Swiss-Prot record:
GO cellular component, one term: plasma membrane
Biological function: Involved in the degradation of specific anti-sigma factors. Responsible for Site-1 cleavage of the RsiW anti-sigma factor. This results, after two other proteolytic steps catalyzed by the RasP and ClpXP proteases, in the release of SigW and the transcription activation of the genes under the control of the sigma-W factor.
Protein name per UniProt: Protease PrsW
Domain of life: Bacteria
Primary gene name: prsW
Species of provenance: Oceanobacillus iheyensis (strain DSM 14371 / CIP 107618 / JCM 11309 / KCTC 3954 / HTE831)
Membrane-spanning intervals of the chain: 1-23, 30-52, 99-120, 129-150, 179-201
GO MF annotations, alphabetized: peptidase activity
Origin organism lineage: Bacteria, Bacillati, Bacillota, Bacilli, Bacillales
Disulfide bonds: none
Segments on the Extracellular side according to the record's topology features: 53-98, 151-178
């Protein structure tokens, strides 16, 4: 069990450390841990809602499952928790901060989801899980956090950026799920898609850091 827990949480901690260490102005560790824990606590309620929806409606559509049962619920709840808990917090005062806190939230979610999967299916899937699901949650978190940070620091376009902070991760997550569930040789399509996401995310990291004001 210890090996599964380690394999389940290590990729998320590694990615979060990378994002945190890129920050020009370090955020309080306790607040990052808080967001990570809140992300972890989202997993079981969302799984329950997803199960209830699939049981009640009994649809047979990969598209609906990928975009609405999975991506919509997960990204909306992450976005909502961010807005409720951290958006008005005094420590959220720079563009890059949005990325740090949104990534913490996303990777907390990814860690528990990953541990549950490895418990059910075996530790031999740990590498693939790290490369695809865990890193994808980090990338969606970076994109969400980029626009949340932009909304906080560029108030002229606040509504637009708050909308993009939810809409873009939702659409990208939906595409990711659709590829994963809709194609038998999904790695051939998912790999270039993930590379594209990494390029976008790294660019967003760079831009947000450039916009960070050091007092």
């Amino acid at each position: 069990m210890l090996s599964i827990l380690s394999a389940g949480i290590a990729p998320a901690l590694a990615l979060l450390s990378y994002i945190y260490l890129k920050d020009k102005i370090t955020e309080p560790i306790w607040l990052i841990i808080r967001m990570f824990i809140l992300g972890a606590l989202l997993v079981l309620p969302i799984m329950f809602i997803q199960y209830a929806i699939s049981s009640e409606f009994n649809y047979d559509s990969i598209f609906i499952e990928a975009f609405f049962q999975i991506a919509l619920l997960e990204e909306f709840f992450k976005w909502f928790v961010f807005m409720f808990v951290i958006y008005q917090h005094e420590e959220f005062d720079n563009h890059y901060d949005g990325i740090v806190y949104a990534s913490s939230l996303s990777l907390g979610f990814a860690s528990i989801e990953n541990i549950l999967y490895l418990i059910t299916n075996g530790i031999e899937y740990a590498f693939l899980r790290a490369v695809f699901p865990v890193s994808s949650h980090a990338l969606f978190g970076i994109i969400m956090g980029y626009y949340l940070g932009k909304a906080k620091t560029h108030t002229n376009y606040k509504k637009k950026n708050l909308t993009l902070a939810f809409l873009l991760p939702f659409l990208l997550h939906g595409i990711y799920n659709f590829i994963l569930k809709g194609f038998s040789s999904f790695t051939l399509i998912l790999t270039p898609f993930m590379v594209l996401l990494w390029i976008i995310a790294l660019y967003r990291l760079k831009r947000a850091n450039e916009n960070t004001i050091i007092n």
